[in-house]
Design a protein with these regions (language model features):
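Residues at alpha-helix caps and immediate loop-helix transition turns in enzyme cores, especially N-
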Residues: 1, 69-70, 99, 119
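Glycine-rich, flexible N-terminal cofactor/catalytic loop recognition
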Residues: 1-14, 21
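Short, surface-exposed alpha-helical segments at coil->helix boundaries
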Residues: 3, 42, 97-100
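Structured adenosyl-cofactor binding patch, chiefly the S-adenosyl-L-methionine
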Residues: 97-141
Length: 141
């Protein structure tokens, strides 16, 4: 499904999907190990982001938007700079505080937790839907 939305988006936007491997916890799940792993992941993520990028991590406490409002957030004439727009899906333990501090705003798909693969498809579909809305083409119903 990701490949299909990437193919559909290719004529509309320049899009790159980058995956950063989840850090190993070394056999434990203590809060300290999780915090250190998130810090290491966060450093890797932040190194990949340009200084002028608009950053939007997915987070449970983020803004829940309908498709029209999401399209409005992606509208280059109204809100975020589209020089580089970076959406971030965290690891199974979330994201580091440093990544959240770098965020321009946070997006939420609701209080449920989704596997990374499904969240990725949902995000790509919503980006595609937003681009269709902004182009005033029929897709969004």
């Amino acid at each position: 499904a990701c490949a299909e939305y990437l193919k559909r988006l290719k004529p509309m936007v320049s899009l790159e999907m980058v995956e950063i491997a989840e850090e190993s916890l070394g056999g434990g799940e203590s809060p300290a190990l999780i915090r250190r792993a998130l810090e290491r992941e966060g450093e890797k993520i932040l190194k990949r982001i340009g200084g002028r990028a608009a950053v939007v991590p997915l987070a449970l406490e983020g803004r829940q938007l309908d498709s029209l409002a999401f399209a409005g957030e992606l509208d280059p004439g109204k809100n975020l700079s589209r020089e580089q727009l970076v959406f971030i899906i965290g690891s199974s333990h979330g994201l580091s505080p440093q990544v959240y501090q770098r965020a321009d705003w946070r997006l939420s798909f609701g209080p449920m937790t989704f596997p990374h693969q499904l969240a990725r498809v949902m995000l790509l579909e919503q980006i595609y839907r937003a681009e269709m809305i902004l182009a005033r083409r029929s897709y969004h119903k």
